[in-house]
A protein has these predicted regions:
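Nucleotide and nucleotide-moiety/phosphate-recognizing core
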Residues: 1-96, 106, 110-120, 127-132, ...
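Intrinsically disordered, low-complexity regions enriched in acidic/Ser/Thr/Pro/Gln residues
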Residues: 137-140
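Conserved TIR/SEFIR loop-to-helix hotspot centered on a Trp-containing motif
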Residues: 99
Length: 173
């Protein structure tokens, strides 16, 4: 979600991973009507990082439109997103499959009519106590969780590099 009120919440972990990649690679963001885009060369490859500027649940239509104007296929994409079903700090990759209940991923799979889209899932844990799922993903991380998420983001970056075909410096799971 592009709005600043989502910064630092479980809902925007994917954005954080992509932002940190852009920063570590020295890429800057350009704004288009659909997305913020950072292009350049990194790790010996041409890369294009995308932050769709729509609500998470509408990511698919924005990414599909962008794929048509920029001529890329879903097989060239790697989605990065939060996963409530993974414990906080866990990171997993998939090369294809269903949405697993994630509305943003469902939107992308529906827009492209394929499940063959690679993904990096960053665990944000489950809502605890009296919080419902929606409130939880829209509430900023507490200090302990923030530390775990920061480590997860580093792990997610390593997994992204692996998926791009570059051996990772640290093989983590």
């Amino acid at each position: 979600n592009p709005e600043t009120r989502y910064a630092g919440t479980p809902h925007n972990v994917g954005y954080e991973v992509v932002e940190r990649l852009a920063l570590s690679w020295g890429l800057s963001w350009d704004m288009t009507p659909e997305a913020l885009i950072a292009r350049g060369s990194a790790e010996g490859k041409n890369v294009c990082l995308v932050k769709i500027q729509t609500a998470m649940n509408l990511t698919g239509s924005g990414l599909k439109h962008l794929s048509e104007s920029m001529a890329f296929s879903p097989e060239q994409c790697i989605l990065v997103f939060d996963d409530l079903d993974l414990p906080i700090s866990a990171v997993k990759t998939r090369i294809k499959g269903g949405a697993g209940g994630h509305r943003g991923v469902a939107s992308v799979l529906e827009a492209f009519q394929t499940d063959a889209i690679r993904r990096v899932k960053v665990g944000v844990g489950k809502a605890g106590g009296k919080l419902d799922r929606v409130t939880y993903v829209l509430t900023a991380f507490d200090e302990e969780s923030r530390i775990a998420i920061d480590q997860s983001i580093l792990t997610a970056k390593a997994h992204l590099l692996d998926m791009m075909g570059r051996p990772s410096v640290a093989k983590t799971h």
